[in-house]
């Protein structure tokens, strides 16, 4: 039977404190959070027990069934969120690498939302794992993770990214500037909103979603993740522009990471990924067609679509 990890035990202790303060509404919400992580909290006169829930009970029928903590103040510094649409071992590698280079002085949680059917035990100890029935798509899985995000800063990481040093602290520090909306090491720019190319920045049109950090309140105010984006491609551009149209900047911040093969791209049949990419780009253009006022620079030449 699975043992409760650090994230589960922390929720249980917070529920004990809420009940002690007679904040029963919060205690009930924390109980639901525990259930979403696969554990039932059974109260005893001298404490409590944490009992694993059968996987089919622990799974949620939809991401929006995940209890939201967004109405409560952030009580952590950073939430690192991962989504799994296959290749759980890549995400496990990524979590382990970020944990091995954990920032000093920052309270960090890792949240995994799995839509691939992987077992929660596939991921490192200490990560909170939300199991979703079926794969509702990239945007919906990211929404589920956001609903559980307690950090003042939300960091999106793709399973193809591995940390080789402290990648979190530089991102958080860059977001201390209130004029900055989102940051990450991989930036892109465009001359015409149709073709995007990599750019070293510092200011860019969009941050690629392989590694992207944003303040939680900014992400929520911008509308969160668009669940129509079932495939990841261009969802990061759309999110970047929704944040930047609020008058905030996107900055490239160099961090110590390495990138492996993006298996969600390379293992998807070419015809399928091209069709999904085209649909996503049209969604972006529906919202931002003609908004060249949002472009940070012009320039000669293009190198094809990115995102």
What does each of the following model-derived ranges do?
Residues 133-149:
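Glycine-rich, basic loop-to-helix element that forms the pyrophosphate-binding segment
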Residues 154:
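Short aromatic/hydrophobic "clamp" motif used to bind/position activated sugar donors
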Residues 96-107:
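Short, acidic, metal-binding catalytic loop of nucleotide-sugar glycosyltransferases
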Residues 55-96:
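N-proximal low-complexity "stem/linker" segments adjacent to membrane-targeting elements
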Residues 64-77, 101, 181-184, 191, ...:
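C-terminal, non-catalytic tails of nucleotide-sugar-dependent glycosyltransferases
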Residues 220-252, 256-259:
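Donor nucleotide-sugar recognition loop
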Residues 162-196:
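Conserved donor NDP-sugar-binding/catalytic core segment of glycosyltransferases
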Residues 196-217, 221, 232:
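A recurrent flexible, glycine/aromatic-enriched loop bordering the glycosyltransferase active site
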């Amino acid at each position: 039977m699975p043992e409760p990890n650090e994230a589960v035990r922390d929720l249980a202790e917070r529920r004990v404190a809420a009940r002690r303060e007679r904040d029963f509404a919060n205690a009930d919400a924390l109980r639901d959070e525990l259930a979403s992580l696969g554990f039932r909290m059974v109260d005893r006169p001298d404490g409590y027990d944490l009992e694993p829930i059968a996987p089919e009970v622990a799974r949620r029928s939809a991401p929006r069934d995940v209890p939201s903590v967004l109405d409560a103040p952030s009580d952590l510094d950073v939430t690192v969120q991962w989504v799994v649409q296959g290749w759980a071992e890549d995400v496990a590698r990524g979590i382990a690498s970020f944990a091995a280079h954990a920032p000093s002085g920052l309270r960090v949680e890792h949240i995994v939302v799995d839509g691939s059917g992987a077992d929660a035990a596939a991921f490192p100890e200490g990560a909170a794992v939300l199991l979703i029935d079926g794969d509702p798509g990239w945007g919906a899985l990211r929404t589920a993770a956001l609903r559980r995000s307690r950090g003042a800063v939300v960091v999106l990481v793709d399973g193809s990214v591995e940390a080789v040093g402290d990648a979190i602290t530089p991102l958080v520090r860059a977001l201390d500037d209130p004029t900055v909306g989102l940051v990450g090491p991989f930036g892109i720019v465009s001359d015409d909103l149709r073709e995007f190319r990599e750019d070293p920045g510092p200011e860019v049109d969009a941050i690629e979603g392989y590694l992207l950090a944003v303040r939680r309140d900014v992400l929520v105010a911008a509308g969160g993740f668009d669940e129509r984006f079932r495939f990841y491609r261009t969802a990061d551009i759309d999110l970047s522009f929704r944040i930047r149209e609020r008058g905030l900047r996107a900055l490239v911040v160099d961090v110590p990471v390495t990138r492996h093969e993006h298996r969600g791209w390379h293992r998807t049949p070419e015809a399928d990924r091209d069709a999904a990419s085209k649909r996503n780009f049209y969604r972006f253009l529906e919202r931002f067609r003609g908004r060249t006022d949002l472009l940070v620079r012009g320039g000669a030449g293009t190198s094809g679509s990115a995102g």
